[in-house]
Amino acid sequence: MKKIIILGATGFIGRNLCEYFSKKNYSVYGTYNKKKFFKNKKIKFLKCNLLNKKQVDNCLKNKDIVIMAAATTSGAKDIIERPYIHVTDNSIMNSIITRSAFDKKIPHVIFFSCTIMYHSQNRKIKEEDFNLNKKINPNYFGGAWMKIFSEKICEFYSKFKVNKYTVIRHSNIYGPHDKFDLQKSHVFGATMTKILNSNNNEITIWGKGNEKRDLLYVEDLCNFVELAIKKQKNSYEVFNVGSGKLISVKNLAKKIAFQAKKKIKLKFDLTKKTIKSRVSLNCSKANKILGWKVKNRLDFGINKTIQWYKKNII
C-alpha cells in the first residue's frame, strides 16, 4: 500500500484530501502544527513545522506521494491590505519541502498552485496562455510570483528525473471545512456565512457584486489529485483544474439563498475594495491526459456545503 502524506492536513483542502484518501487504498499521513488535528483512525498525524527542514525531512521519510496542501491563505481583505503575508513563509516552506522530497527521492510530488497569475480574459484560459512578460494584477503581484517561483522549483527538480511533479492551478475551491470566518474567508465562505447567519434577511456585499469567479467543489479537486497519482506519466505537468464556468458574486449569493430556502435582500457597499478579475479555466488538458471532468454541479455543491455548515458550525 502506497504511503501518501498530506502537508497542511488541518487546512481546508488538506482536510478534504485526508478524508477522501482515507477511504481509498492508501496509507494516509497528515501534518499539523498550530491547529489541532481532527480524529480519524485511518489517518496518522505528524506534528511538523514546515519551515523547519529537519522536521520536514523526518515527516517525508519513506513516503511515496507528497501533497503540498499547506499555505498561508486568506481572503480579499488581506490580499489588498497585507499582501506580504502570503509571500515570505510560503516561499520558504515550498523551497524546503521540494528540496526534501528531491533528496529523499519521493516518487511523486503534488503542488497546489492557483490561478492568480492569469490575466483576465473573455475566453477560457489554457495553461500555456500565461505570459510571464505581461503585467500581473497589482493586488496579486506578490502572491502570484510566489506561486510561479514555486512552480519553477518543481520544474527545476523534475529535470533530474528523480521524481515526478504535478502542479495544480485550481480555481476558487469551496465546500466542507472551508474558512467561514469573515475576516479570513474567500468569497464563497464569506457569502454563505452572511446568508446563513442573517437575522434580518439582508446581507451586504462588497462592491457591486459583478465580480465573477470560477467555482469548483472540493471533492472534484480531490478526484483530480487521485487521477494525477494514477495516470500522470511525464516528470512535470501543469494542469488547470476548475469548472470552466463563471458566476458573479451577486448571483452566487442568490443561489446560496435559494438553496438555503432564505429570502435575502442584497445591499452593496461601494466603499469596500474588491478585486476585479475574470478568469475562467479551460481544463481540456486534464480531461485529455487524465480523463478528469467536473462531476458536481454548483447547485449540488452549494446544497452539500449548506448541510455540512448547519451540522458543524451553526
Language-model features, listed with the residues they occupy:
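NAD(P)H-binding glycine-rich loop region in Rossmannoid oxidoreductase-like domains
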Residues: L50-D89
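N-terminal Rossmann NAD(P)H-binding glycine-rich loop of SDR-like oxidoreductase domains
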Residues: I4-K24
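N-terminal Rossmann-fold cofactor-binding loop
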Residues: T31-K35, L50
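Rossmann-fold cofactor-recognition segment
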Residues: K42-N52
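C-terminal substrate-binding subdomain of Rossmann-fold SDR/epimerase-dehydratase oxidoreductases
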Residues: N197-I314
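Active-site helix of classical SDR
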Residues: G142-F149
